[in-house]
Design a protein with these regions (language model features):
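ATP/NTP phosphate-donor binding region
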Residues: 1-64, 71, 75-76, 107-111
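Short hydrophobic segments within beta-strands
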Residues: 7-9, 89, 224
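Cofactor-binding loop segments of dinucleotide-utilizing enzymes, especially the Rossmann-like FAD-
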Residues: 9-11, 91, 319
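Catalytic core of DAGKc-family lipid kinases
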Residues: 16, 82-220
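Short, well-ordered alpha-helical microsegments
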Residues: 47-48, 70-71, 230-231, 300
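Catalytic core of tubulin tyrosine ligase-like
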Residues: 160, 225, 312
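Glycine-rich phosphate/pyrophosphate-binding beta-alpha loops
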Residues: 208, 222-234
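ATP/nucleoside-binding phosphotransfer catalytic cores, i.e., glycine-rich phosphate-binding loops
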Residues: 212-215, 231-320
Length: 320
């Protein structure tokens, strides 16, 4: 009998829909042994490790949730020694992973699974200061964009999403308010280097007896593997490629620069460079920054960040 492990977050703003559209129907279908894993209020890595403890060869990991919940399922599928298949149904704000794979209904996903509509996904892998951090199916980011995701963990924001507000429009509105109140801050240090090359045009100037650093600072660096980022910005189908992914960075404190960057990203694709080897970000002095993968963020003390394509691929269900 086919085992299905449903991964979901009981605190999700769409918990009622997940129960009605995924959990109850799955239990009613004959021929499946259905188990559940409830995402706990702990880091992605700990949730993923706990999930691996119940996985067996042949399991279907069925994620019903947003990109954060999907990241737990992805990391468990990458970490386990069992041969598993991952399916994702989007019940979040942006649903980049679910949209990338094309599945939207539980019944359709099961039909595609039975038909063998399965492809290999090559996720990104990040290492912080030489230590493994996390896998990401869609993207990693550091800087301003990463810090903005904290807005969705604010109690008032979560309550508003649960009340059924238009999620995309509401989310964009919240992010823009946050941007205008936060854009003058320094999100990344001035001495940031990408593959040993400085990406800031900074200079030291005199202000009385003090030396001050002037110039436009980089606010964001993104590593993109998916068709979309935050639902609107266009990436590419790098997730199916063994080596390639996109690296994009920008100086986005200026409203005009942000507008140009967003217009290019929405109408065409994210500006950046396609990489086929690992990318190293480093600072001359340790800096506390925010890093996030698919909406799951963490503040870390960073001297070096290395991102590359993982050597391991996993099987994922895609729309036939």
């Amino acid at each position: 009998m086919q085992r299905v492990i449903i991964v979901y977050n009981p605190r999700s703003s769409k918990q009622a829909l997940i129960q009605d559209e995924v959990i109850k129907p799955m239990r009613a279908i004959k021929g499946y042994q259905v188990g559940k894993y409830e995402v706990k209020q702990m880091p992605v890595e700990e949730n993923a490790k706990n999930l691996t403890k119940i996985l067996m060869d042949g399991d279907l990991i069925l994620v019903a949730g947003g990109d954060g919940t999907a990241t737990v399922g992805l990391n468990a599928a990458m970490m386990t020694k069992a041969k598993v298949t991952l399916g994702v149904l989007g019940y979040g704000n942006f649903n980049d992973m679910a949209n990338m794979l094309g599945e939207h209904k539980c019944e359709d996903l099961l039909v595609d699974f039975q038909r063998g509509s399965i492809r290999q996904l090559y996720p990104l892998e990040a290492r912080i200061n030489g230590e493994f951090f996390r896998y990401a199916a869609c993207y990693f980011s550091i800087g301003m964009f990463a810090e903005s995701t904290e807005e969705f963990n604010v109690k008032d924001t979560r309550n508003s999403l649960k009340k059924g507000k238009k999620r995309l429009a509401y989310s964009i509105k919240k992010l823009m308010r946050w941007y205008f109140s936060s854009r003058k801050r320094n999100f990344l240090p001035p001495d940031i280097q990408l593959n040993d090359t400085p990406i800031n045009n900074m200079r030291i100037a005199k202000n009385g007896r003090k030396n001050i650093t002037r110039g436009r600072r980089t606010t964001d660096v993104l590593f993109v593997n998916s068709d979309t980022v935050a639902k609107m910005m266009k990436g590419g189908n790098y997730w199916q490629r063994k080596d390639e992914y996109l690296v994009s960075h920008g100086k986005l404190k200026n409203v005009f620069r942000l507008g140009v960057f967003m217009m290019k990203s929405i109408l065409f694709h994210l500006p950046g460079k396609v990489m086929s080897k690992e990318t190293k970000i480093d600072f001359s002095t340790p800096s506390e920054i925010e890093i996030q993968a698919e909406g799951e963020y963490k503040r870390v003390q960073l001297t070096e960040l290395v991102v590359k394509k993982s050597d391991k691929a996993i099987n994922v269900i895609t729309k036939s």
